[in-house]
A protein has these predicted regions:
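Positively charged n-region of N-terminal signal peptides that target proteins for export
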Residues: 1-4
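Conserved SGNH/GDSL esterase-like catalytic core that processes O-acyl groups on lipids
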Residues: 30-35, 41-127, 156, 165, ...
Length: 175
């Protein structure tokens, strides 16, 4: 129930952001290509049918045929280049770049709260994020990049303990 609520909330926030992002200018070149870049949350891990229940699939359903929404999620991916599984070293990253999207939705950072990552590389988070955004803008200078806030975490998830919750809040405060 809680997971489904957060997915619906996430979809609503994406849809609202997209509708306010000036995509009317993009409609001249239909379909508008949307790349959903992220980790297991984007990928749809844990869902009964990720092909229809992941947020990129739901976003495609909401936006309709004028959009081509693709899922470039990689479970365990980190934004940090020196993280334990950097997104930029995954095939999904190469595929997302090749897609040359008009809109890129980035939902990365939750795995960066891992004790192997955040304590050691937190100072590189913003520069690594900017580098990722710049890469997509070099491929398509007119693309719009939307950054999703981190999915809320709870004490019920065994991985998110003690300092990890604090690091999660630090990442969410980055602007």
């Amino acid at each position: 129930m809680t997971r489904r609520f957060f997915i619906i909330l996430l979809l609503f926030s994406y849809f609202f952001t997209l509708s306010c992002a000036g995509v009317e200018n993009l409609k001249a070149s239909l379909p508008i290509k949307v790349a959903c870049v992220g980790n297991s949350i984007t990928y749809g891990s844990g869902l009964a049918n990720r092909e229809t229940e992941s947020y990129p699939a739901r976003l495609q359903e909401m936006l309709g045929n004028d959009y081509d929404v693709r899922n470039f999620g990689r479970p365990g991916a980190t934004l940090l280049r020196k993280g334990h599984r950097p997104y930029i070293q995954q095939k999904e990253y190469a595929n997302a770049k090749a897609f040359a999207a008009d809109i890129v939705v980035i939902h990365l950072g939750i795995n960066d709260t891992d004790p192997r990552n955040w304590p050691n590389y937190r100072d590189e988070f913003i520069s690594d994020y900017r580098a990722l955004i710049d890469t997509f803008r070099m491929i398509n200078p007119k693309c719009r990049v939307l950054i999703a806030r981190l999915t809320p975490i709870t004490i019920l998830h065994p991985r998110f303990e003690s300092g990890t919750r604090d690091w999660h809040d630090e990442i969410n405060e980055v602007e």
